[in-house]
Amino acid sequence: MNKFSDNEPEPSDWQEQLELLQGFTLELQSLAQEMVLLLREHNESNWEKIYSNFAEAIGNSKSNRQRLKAIDYIHSIYGGMGSWNDFYLLALGEAEEQRMSLGNAIYNLAKKMKTQIITGPKEPKRSIWQKLTGRSSRSYF
């Protein structure tokens, strides 16, 4: 399911890093939306809401801080009692296999994205004005 191979060249600057992260973001959002549809089909509204929130959070993330927050949110459902690992669809078989496959793909791609954020080229610092307006200072000249 995941379009991103482990044999990719490492980004050499922030622009390349951003393009890679945007690709991860689109794929994660797509996988999460696919999960939402599966869970909705099986009336699992609580888990559906969690994956819907993740799809929205990762899709709207504009900074590494926001990306990491979304990744930590989705990774938090994978441990402890009553976690995603303890859950299964009552309609076993193909639906449960799809749930497991999507869940694993989301977890692994989010982990890969987090590693890339931590180890790859760093995001440039933004001024308070840029943070407040969401714009680059260059867009005004």
Indicate residue ranges for each PLM-predicted region.
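Amphipathic alpha-helical binding modules
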Residues: I74-F141
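Amphipathic coiled-coil alpha-helices
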Residues: F24, L31, A57, S61-Q66, ...
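Short terminal alpha-helical segments
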Residues: N2-N53, A110, K114, Q130-Y140
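Amphipathic alpha-helical interaction modules
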Residues: L38-L89
